[in-house]
Amino acid sequence: MVRLGSYCEHNGSISQAWLDSGLSPCFYFTLVPSVLLSFSFLLGALQSALYARHSTTMEPKYIPRSRLYRLQIVLSVVLILQSVIGLIWQAAGTDVVYGYMIVHGCLSVVAWGFSLWLLHLERTRALVREKSRGHGVVLLLFWALAFAAENLAFISWQSPNWWWLSRDTVPQKVQFGLWITRYVCTLFLFVLGIRAPGRPRKPYIVLINEDERDVETSQPLLRDPNQSTWQGFKKKLLLVMQYIWPRRNIPLQLLVALCMGLMGLERAINVFVPIYAKKIVDGLTEDSTWNILAVTVCIYVLLKFLQGGGAGTTGFLSNLRTFMWIRVQQFTNREVQIRLFAHLHSLSLRWHLGRKTGEVLRSVDRGTSSINSLLSYIVFSILPTIADIVIGIVYFTSSFNAWFGLIIFVCMTLYLTLTIIITEWRTKYRREMNTRDNEAKSRAVDSLLNFETVKYYNAEGYEVGRFNDSIMKYQVSEWKVNASLAMLNQTQNLIIGLGLLAGSLLCAYFVTENKFKVGDYVLFGTYIIQLYTPLNWFGTYYRMIQSSFIDMENMFELFNEDQEVKDAVNAPALMFRSGKIEFENVHFSYLDGKEILRDISFTVMPGQSIALVGPSGSGKSTIIRLLFRFYDVKGGTIKVDGQDISTVRQESLRSHIGVVPQDTVLFNDTIRNNIRYGRVSATDDEVEEAAAAADIHERILSFRDGYDTQTGERGLKLSGGEKQRVAIARTILKAPQIILLDEATSALDTETERNIQASLAKVCANRTTIVVAHRLSTVINSDQILVLKEGQIVERGRHEELLLKGGVYAGMWQKQQSGSESSSDSDSERKDRTSEKLQPPKATPRRGH
């Protein structure tokens, strides 16, 4: 006959948490399922309500079939069954069932049953606006709490009420077996929960919209502000951590090791500071000798000197560690920026044309600076704080009693849980603020880069208004971020205050009962304040880490951008011989379904010049870009001296090609350095020789600063003709064997064009040349003219031959000739305007006195 005993064994009290050098089984097996059920039911109910309102049923084809998910189900069911089996065995095997056993069995069944329901809910439904993958915060924290609770059993290692010391009886063996089952199951559930095998590998919103992508930029059209910052946490962390260890730099590696050692020493000092404070107080109250007291005080002051202002943030060790870390931090910053800058230059022209430079630079700036912050917060703030918390729990549990360890444990759990929940909720506001900030900065940069256009249309007020709108939107998002931050800080302060109050009252009570000494109260107060000081910053650390991850998201996206045009593994260099160019049945399209070039075939013999003419959009400039390998062809081949350019290294191909584009963009540097960019190792004499060959040497000398004249942003201080001549001089200095002229004179007046043509003739002499021309008069002497229309070559031949055919070329020639007279006057006026940019200094006559 089963007999129902008292609630606790031996008529004990549940309030007696510490019993016989360990946790009371009655207290432990009541507390753990109560906390788990409360957590899973309260927060799980909120999650269920959220899913009921905002979720949609996932299509079966998107739900992964995983054995690991089945293992999650099995482990949860095992935990439910072990609670029932343990209760049944207790009733059948011992004939006595205590109240706490019934409570433990019932609450555990309900808690794990509810977690099983949440697991099924997250597998079959998805939030409409959710872009994160993986399990929700509720399940992850539930499994973490369950596993942490099983680890609390180790505190009772020396207690005879548990199975650690002796497992001679059957009940002890059964209880130990049930604990092993719970420990293994909760451990695997926690690990599997991080992997989330039952959830899609991609966010559901991405799966159902995979076809709705911007082809040009390869970016998802839908961008959700609610995406979890911790999505891809492992990948991000591994990418960041590789910069903390300076490879091939032994001195910096030693600095990293020393910094880690100092950080460990700080943790030990944090324990001894309160202990010596207790010894001083006990020595003063117990009339210790002066010698002992003086030594104790000296040791205490030395420890405080090493530790610093209560939290190890301004002490000798901390300052020494910070000083040694400077070089490591500089190494990290340099490596990230150089690697990212090189990666950006390796991306295709298509990618750069699809991005705003201001936004890219803003993302790079914030991303690189956030990496150092992230490393500092994780290595020197988060890890030490967690270590201090664990050490504090173990110390107070072993040196005081379990109540103090329990108070700290509960406060830490509540603090971390609420911090994570509220901060995750705030993420969307932070991300929105970053987006608005990018938009505002990009709008300002775009407006300033188009300064002349703004002036042409008297649009200053319009631009200021647009910028004001951007700032207003940014400040709305900023207010949400700061308001939610204030709420988080209040929540954290409340939890810390309640924990400090509970511990202080309990310690004071034991002092009045003569169970503790006054020094013990001082030790507790000193230690707990010392512990809570970094804990008070824990929320800030979490927010800053999250903020750093948010700031790095765009930078990681840049790192993840694949090179559209990249060299094959072990690709050889181009073996240049004479400069023969062959296009064989070339097809190309920027977007799928719309071919720009169709079956293009032609050959340029060494030293010959070929002209590409035709209406806008016919594919002339595309041929230039394909030959320079800004893009790879979709079909056919392009050969230089019989070698397919897609199989050779880009660097070797481009070293033999010189380009003079239609819109020459100069660096904001001196004219000398802009010309020298054609060959950075060139001497000043070689630069001036190239300028003379481009017929701009005398013009440069007429400027006040000569070759040291600044060209301004994008070369805006120079006229169009001057910029083109600088570009020609740059190409002459490069001395390429192949010349590509992409409508190099189309934006110039007739007289300037004639002068430029003379300079171009010098550049192209005895070189293979391809010219894209709008004005047919500039290509009449070409060895061959190709007429393109709608991506196809419709005519080819010399100037006279094409005129005799009376086809497309003849029509274009006739049209341009008939309009040449009417445009001559406007050309002269344009010349006058374009030569006004930089004028040589005029002598200023002196006035007489």
UniProtKB/Swiss-Prot annotation:
GO terms for cellular component: early endosome membrane; endolysosome membrane; endoplasmic reticulum membrane; extracellular exosome; Golgi apparatus; Golgi membrane; late endosome membrane; lysosomal membrane. Residues 581-815 form the ABC transporter domain. Residues 47-72, 120-136, 195-254, 313-373, 423-492, 542-849 are cytoplasmic. GO terms for biological process: cellular detoxification of cadmium ion; heme metabolic process; heme transmembrane transport; intracellular copper ion homeostasis; melanosome assembly; porphyrin-containing compound metabolic process; tetrapyrrole metabolic process. Its main location: membrane. Residues 814-825 have a biased composition (Low complexity). Residues 827-836 have a biased composition (Basic and acidic residues). PROSITE patterns: ABC_TM1F (PS50929), ABC_TRANSPORTER_1 (PS00211), ABC_TRANSPORTER_2 (PS50893). Residues 814-849 are annotated as: Disordered. Keywords: ATP-binding, Cell membrane, Disulfide bond, Endoplasmic reticulum, Endosome, Glycoprotein, Golgi apparatus, Lysosome, Membrane, Mitochondrion, Mitochondrion outer membrane, Nucleotide-binding, Secreted, Translocase, Transmembrane, Transmembrane helix, Transport. Homodimer. It comes from Xenopus tropicalis (Western clawed frog). PANTHER family: ATP-BINDING CASSETTE SUB-FAMILY B, ATP-BINDING CASSETTE SUB-FAMILY B MEMBER 6. Its EC number is 7.6.2.5. Residues 256-547 form the ABC transmembrane type-1 domain. CDD domains: ABC_6TM_ABCB6, ABCC_ATM1_transporter. Contains two independently folding units, the N-terminal transmembrane domain (residues 1-205) and the ABC-core domain (206-842) are respectively responsible for the lysosomal targeting and the ATPase activity. This is ATP-binding cassette sub-family B member 6. Residues 1-227 are annotated as: Required for ATPase activity. Coiled coil: none annotated. The chain crosses the membrane at residues 26-46, 73-93, 99-119, 137-157, 174-194, 255-275, 292-312, 374-394, 402-422, 493-513, 521-541.
